[in-house]
Amino acid sequence: MSQGTIVQCIGAVVDIQFPREAMPKVYDALKLENAAGSFAEEGLTFEVQQQLGDGVVRTIAMGSSDGLRRGMKVASTGKGISIPVGHGTLGRIMDVLGRPIDEAGPIEADELRPIHAKAPKFDELSPSVDLLETGIKVIDLVCPFAKGGKVGLFGGAGVGKTVNMMELINNIAKQHSGLSVFAGVGERTREGNDFYHEMKDSNVLDKVAMVFGQMNEPPGNRLRVALTGLTMAERFRDEGRDILFFVDNIYRYTLAGTEVSALLGRMPSAVGYQPTLAEEMGRLQERITSTKVGSITSIQAVYVPADDLTDPSPATTFLHLDSTVVLSRDIAALGIYPAVDPLDSTSRQLDPLVVGEEHYNVARQVQVTLQRYKELRDIIAILGMDELSPEDKLAVSRARKIQRFLSQPFHVAEVFTGSPGKYVPLKDTINGFKMIVNGECDHLPEQAFYMVGGIEEAMEKAKKLQ
């Protein structure tokens, strides 16, 4: 175990000098000497980012750098950051270094795995076309998820990314008998606490492993915490299991990379992001994949800065996803939740060969009707409904019913709305929208379709309104 001394501290970036012949490798973990003169596991950890030459390495502190000073002793562990994986992590909350933060004693791990690993080889990958039912109408209809696929929830501030993710966890993780891993990357600590209690109250805590590196953590922690969660998910996948991997929020991962890049003195690229943005994103996303042994289905929340989907961070994330669920501020302003934009959201699974002719045709008819309404909105605003042709009046009437029928009460929002959450099976979703586009519901008032589950519930509500 080679030892070095701190020669410079600039915030989270620390330069450490080692003997020339014993310089640590890039991504090696280093430990700080404690007051007792030992290099304890719970002490401050550094990760090597650059070798500057002459025995000096530039590192990022994986914790607060308060109290560091020049001349302090640091030891190389000779390997990268390794974390406990396996069944001992289920029901536990860990930090980026795999240390428990739930005050429930040490974690009994099957093994320790390094967080830096190569993506599976091309011949080990396994494509998947099986659909994953979510019980959320708008998602199942226009942007269906694939088992073993990658899904992104895109949205600006306050349009419901985390609530949608919590509902997906509620509907999938509880129905799905497999295991889940949740990585909280740079988000609010309160949300992590809510998530933990939600899982505990639902009695599924023993099927979930959680890792958090929240907003108050240094950039090194936020940059690596997604890899920690992914390493845990990979271990379960390699056992032949189907894993759900939730990440909230991928944008904070990018942002932490930007902070680290600036601290390391790299020249920024477009909009101030790090020059290695595409490579860093690819390194994470290429590992989130399904092999012939097991699958990882990943659902990632992606914050969209200033609601601009062309921003380099969300734009780079788009490339890696199978389904994109775009949350719209305009739809949220109408009071329609989930505020998913059915015209902007896409999925590779929405193909007649995968979902079947009926599902595909209904979804496309819904989109065509909503698109026609969008085109007519300006005319309606200027001239009013009376100036439209009978066909257009009918299209607008159906579109407004579809728009309201795309809303749905959530289980996780019951405490705020007072209305019980609804899980809608896929066949009921297709049947409901098919009836609306075919004109079988033209006689019903549009208010009857707002915040209901299936079409039968809308009909019951219509009877009460009449």
Swiss-Prot record:
From the Swiss-Prot or TrEMBL record, what is one GO molecular function term?
ATP binding
Checking InterPro entries in the record gives: AAA+_ATPase, ATP-synt_VA_C, ATP_synth_F1_bsu, ATPase_a/bsu_AS, ATPase_alpha/beta_chains, ATPase_F1/V1/A1_a/bsu_N, ATPase_F1/V1/A1_a/bsu_N_sf, ATPase_F1/V1/A1_a/bsu_nucl-bd
Give GO cellular component annotations, separated by semicolons. Answer: plasma membrane; proton-transporting ATP synthase complex
- Keyword tags: ATP synthesis, ATP-binding, Cell inner membrane, Cell membrane, CF(1), Hydrogen ion transport, Ion transport, Membrane, Nucleotide-binding, Translocase, Transport
Q: Where are the bilayer-spanning segments?
A: none
Give the residues the record marks as binding ATP: G155, G156, A157, G158, V159, G160, K161, T162
Task: Please list the reactions this protein catalyses.
Answer: ATP + H2O + 4 H(+)(in) = ADP + phosphate + 5 H(+)(out)
The protein's Enzyme Commission number: 7.1.2.2
Identify the enzyme class: translocase
CDD domains (alphabetical) = ATP-synt_F1_beta_C (cd18110), ATP-synt_F1_beta_N (cd18115), F1-ATPase_beta_CD (cd01133)
Where can this protein be found? Answer: Cell inner membrane
What topology in the membrane does the UniProt record assign? Peripheral membrane protein
Database matches in Gene3D superfamilies:
2.40.10.170, Bovine Mitochondrial F1-atpase, Atp Synthase Beta Chain, Chain D, domain 3, P-loop containing nucleotide triphosphate hydrolases
On subunit structure and binding partners, the annotation says:
F-type ATPases have 2 components, CF(1) - the catalytic core - and CF(0) - the membrane proton channel. CF(1) has five subunits: alpha(3), beta(3), gamma(1), delta(1), epsilon(1). CF(0) has three main subunits: a(1), b(2) and c(9-12). The alpha and beta chains form an alternating ring which encloses part of the gamma chain. CF(1) is attached to CF(0) by a central stalk formed by the gamma and epsilon chains, while a peripheral stalk is formed by the delta and b chains.
Against HAMAP family, the record matches this protein to: ATP_synth_beta_bact
Q: Which family does it belong to?
A: Belongs to the ATPase alpha/beta chains family.
What is the protein name stated in its UniProt record?
ATP synthase subunit beta
**What is the originating organism of this protein?**
Aromatoleum aromaticum (strain DSM 19018 / LMG 30748 / EbN1) (Azoarcus sp. (strain EbN1))
Give the classification, highest ranks: Bacteria, Pseudomonadati, Pseudomonadota, Betaproteobacteria, Rhodocyclales
Gene name for this UniProt entry? atpD
